[in-house]
């Protein structure tokens, strides 16, 4: 009897010990896979292409996210992760557990990617930015522009008027058509009835406002001056005068770094050369921002017909009503150019 009791006691102890060991192991596994997180100092982006296999996804997780990534890869493998659902971009935050990483990727719960452009001149440059930030490439974006924008009333030279600089969010996998349509949709909402009425009051279409705004942005570094500059161009158009805007010449030449416009530049044959052609150029010379467009729409009437960069190289301008006054301003500016040996 005593011997049997001793055996039972031993069995109970062994069972208890094994149970404790099992619980401890389970807790360690749980902690390792469900609590202990990615130990990177900053967030990490994981990009999974549509042609990637389950094996290659596991390899990426392991190589990019260290020990936590290897555990996520183990879960992925054991659970038979579906590669077709994982296509996308995922932002992995510090502290994110292996289990959470697995769930995020296996469900295709992508993290939106920010597409920000504030100083993009051309649609080609915008296409390059889209190609760097999203899965699609620049050529596909431009092709989507050609397919979509003419149907919305934009001529090829007017494509820059279809977009507004800002920060936008897209899934990395967004199609180029989705990107173009979304960006253009923001522009359409910006041009509400109130703004369209203001443009009409100036005798302009929204595209023409964007053209004037684009030249004003290139003409002056001072945002407070852009409405005045835009109204000056409008004054000249209404009087049948050529704009004679230097930024349009730089655009025609293809060199915005020019510091001094000379006779050879003015002689360039281009529909964008407003020294050669009357009226507005056929399209914007850059993607104009909302603030400048609003400045044009809200600009106060004034009599100025001429402007010249200030001789202090501040990026601001001296404005003039008469050509004689303008010549005096121009003479001061050219003396300043010569004194700095700017050719």
Where do the protein language model's features map onto the residues?
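Conserved SxxK-family serine transpeptidase/carboxypeptidase catalytic domain
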Residues: 244-286
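Conserved catalytic or metal-liganding residues and their short signature motifs at active sites
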Residues: 1-244, 249-254, 286-291, 295-303, ...
